[in-house]
Regions:
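Generic structural signal for well-ordered, non-membrane alpha-helices
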Residues: 32, 36-39, 95-99, 118-121, ...
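Membrane-interface, cytosolic juxtamembrane amphipathic helix immediately N-terminal to a transmembrane helix
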Residues: 106-146
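Acidic, low-complexity proline/glycine-rich segments
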Residues: 2-6, 88-90
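Bilayer-spanning, highly hydrophobic alpha-helical transmembrane segments
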Residues: 5-16, 131-157
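Glycine- and small-hydrophobic-enriched helix-loop-helix hairpins
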Residues: 43-44, 49-113, 117
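Juxtamembrane/interface alpha-helical elements of multi-pass membrane proteins
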Residues: 5-72
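Short hydrophobic/aromatic segments of transmembrane alpha-helices and their interfaces
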Residues: 34-35, 79, 143-145
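Membrane-interfacial loop-to-transmembrane-helix junctions in polytopic alpha-helical membrane proteins
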Residues: 1, 24-27, 131-134
Length: 157
């Protein structure tokens, strides 16, 4: 019976470590997808000149948070300031993206391309910091949770 309880505790702690690793991976995925969105939107502004809502509806994202954010922007549901429903991004990052999305279309194409480049540099710096964080802490969280689980089992026995 002690073995089953011990294994359950260790598996539970490992699960927490894997959840932390997954959260860090989702943050990296969000910023990668946002960068891909910016690259494709830059091409759209330069050549296709499709409307923003049409472009967003045709954009397929692997990040659920980016999809939620873009859908809320196009739908403008009952509450524009709704910050719930995002799993890994912070409210400051949501505000940064919203500020960019609301600034789209207020200038001509040349200035719009410059705005996209400025926003892209901000996102690139965030993406680089998130990649460093992921490479530093993802494996560590699983190992640390395993060690913590074993330590709890030892203390319980």
């Amino acid at each position: 019976m002690n073995i089953i309880i011990s294994l359950s505790v260790v598996v539970g702690f490992i699960y927490l470590g894997l959840c932390t690793k997954n959260m860090l991976k989702e943050r990296v995925l969000f910023f990668e997808e946002l960068e891909r969105f910016l690259n494709e939107f830059k091409v759209n502004v330069s050549f296709a000149q499709m409307g923003l809502s049409d472009f967003i509806n045709n954009f397929n994202s692997k990040s659920s948070d980016l999809t939620i954010l873009l859908n809320r922007f196009t739908n403008l549901t009952k509450n524009q300031n709704e910050e719930k429903g995002f799993s890994v991004i912070k409210s400051e990052e949501v505000d940064l993206v919203k500020e960019f999305l609301f600034s789209i279309g207020k200038t001509d194409a040349t200035n719009q391309l410059q705005e996209i480049e400025v926003f892209k540099t901000k996102i690139s710096s965030l993406l680089n910091s998130e990649r460093k964080t992921y490479s530093k802490y993802a494996g560590l969280s699983v190992k640390l949770s395993l060690m913590l689980g074993v330590m709890v089992v030892i203390l319980l026995l």
